[in-house]
């Protein structure tokens, strides 16, 4: 139990990358927690947004690998926001505080939905240069819980945790997936009642993405084809919404492929970001591009990637 938490990689990450806390709202209780790693000279970094159960450190394997290649990577943890507009306004203020005009977003599950909503929210003055959507959805009604969304704030923490755990894989899984689930359960335990209630509210509050507002943004849809909380219908809906998106398919990986299939996920992220090399929206230090590109081409041979 808890193999990831005691792994050398995780401990190295925790000891070398500081967790920063930033307040951008008038309400001092709304605190963004984030890891910001890689060259500060990069002005269009890749930002990771976690799922309901996740904290910023669930992306530690992406941070370690991608910064090793010369990328600037930021992983976030949300403050307590109760609606999508409030989240988008807070996230915009955070980007202003970090002096980042445009960013690439990697969103997992709820993080993927919020990434799309933020791109939609800023479409008149775009802040999102590209999207990587991992196990993401475009309409909260798929969870059939829009009617309970307004009552999560009343529920005790143990009940909220039970709701989240109900979406975790319960069948047989391989050891790496089991470790990923254990780690996410541990992260879930670290979240307080208001953090969980607000995330579940954002996850289930009646809302959908308006694709015409973000159709010009390059998108990669990353899907897992074994057990995950998303139905086949929800995945098909994403393909319809983004007909020109690249598709990155993982045969296995469950709800948390960034933990248990990190090498594949990292490679797909690199392939996605490759298209921006040599532009002002590159997320990588230009001096290391050629070696990194070579490595990506090698790894690409063994992956399932569909161009639109």
UniProtKB/Swiss-Prot annotation:
**Sequence similarity:** Belongs to the AB hydrolase superfamily.
Q: Which organism is it from?
A: Mus musculus
| Protein's cellular compartments | Cytoplasm
Main location as per UniProt? cytoplasm
Q: InterPro entries this protein is in?
A: AB_hydrolase_1, AB_hydrolase_fold, Maspardin
One GO term of the cellular component aspect?
Answer: trans-Golgi network transport vesicle
Task: Give the protein's function.
Answer: May play a role as a negative regulatory factor in CD4-dependent T-cell activation.
What is this protein called in UniProt?
Maspardin
Provide the AB hydrolase-1 domain boundaries: 87-159
Location of Phosphoserine modifications = 304
Q: Which UniProt keywords apply?
A: Cytoplasm, Phosphoprotein
**Single Gene Ontology BP annotation:** limb development
Subunit relationships: Interacts with CD4. Interacts with ALDH16A1.
Output one GO MF annotation. Answer: CD4 receptor binding
For this protein, the record's Pfam families field holds: Abhydrolase_1
Tissue specificity note: Expressed in cell lines FT.1 and in a L cell fibroblast derivative (at protein level).
User: In the UniProt record, does the keyword Phosphoprotein occur?
Assistant: yes
């Amino acid at each position: 139990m808890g193999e990831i938490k005691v792994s050398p990689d995780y401990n190295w990450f925790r000891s070398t990358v500081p967790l920063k806390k930033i307040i951008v709202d008038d309400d001092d209780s709304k605190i963004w927690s984030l890891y910001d790693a890689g060259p500060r000279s990069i002005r269009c970094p890749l930002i990771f947004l976690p799922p309901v159960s996740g904290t910023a450190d669930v992306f530690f394997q992406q941070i370690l690998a991608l910064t090793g290649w010369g990328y600037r990577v930021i992983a976030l943890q949300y403050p307590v926001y109760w609606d999508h507009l409030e989240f988008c306004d807070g996230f915009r203020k955070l980007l202003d505080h970090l002096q980042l005009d445009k960013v690439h977003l990697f969103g997992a599950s709820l993080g993927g939905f919020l990434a799309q909503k933020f791109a939609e929210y800023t479409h008149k003055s775009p802040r999102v240069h590209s999207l990587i959507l991992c196990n993401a959805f475009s309409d909260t009604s798929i969870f059939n819980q829009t009617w309970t969304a307004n009552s999560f704030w009343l529920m005790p923490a143990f009940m909220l945790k039970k709701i989240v755990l109900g979406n975790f894989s319960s069948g047989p899984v391989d050891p790496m997936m089991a470790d990923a689930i254990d780690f996410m359960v541990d992260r879930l335990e670290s979240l307080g009642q208001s953090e969980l209630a607000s995330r579940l509210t954002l996850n289930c509050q009646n809302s959908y993405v308006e694709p015409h507002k973000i159709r010009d943004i390059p998108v990669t849809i990353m899907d897992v084809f074994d057990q995950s909380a998303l139905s086949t219908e929800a995945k098909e809906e994403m393909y319809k919404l983004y007909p020109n998106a690249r598709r990155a398919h993982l045969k296995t990986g469950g709800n948390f492929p960034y933990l248990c299939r990190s090498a594949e996920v990292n490679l797909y992220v690199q392939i996605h970001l490759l298209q921006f090399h040599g532009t002002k929206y590159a997320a990588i230090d230009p001096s290391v591009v050629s070696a990194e590109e070579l490595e990506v081409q090698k790894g690409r041979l063994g992956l399932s990637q569909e161009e639109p």
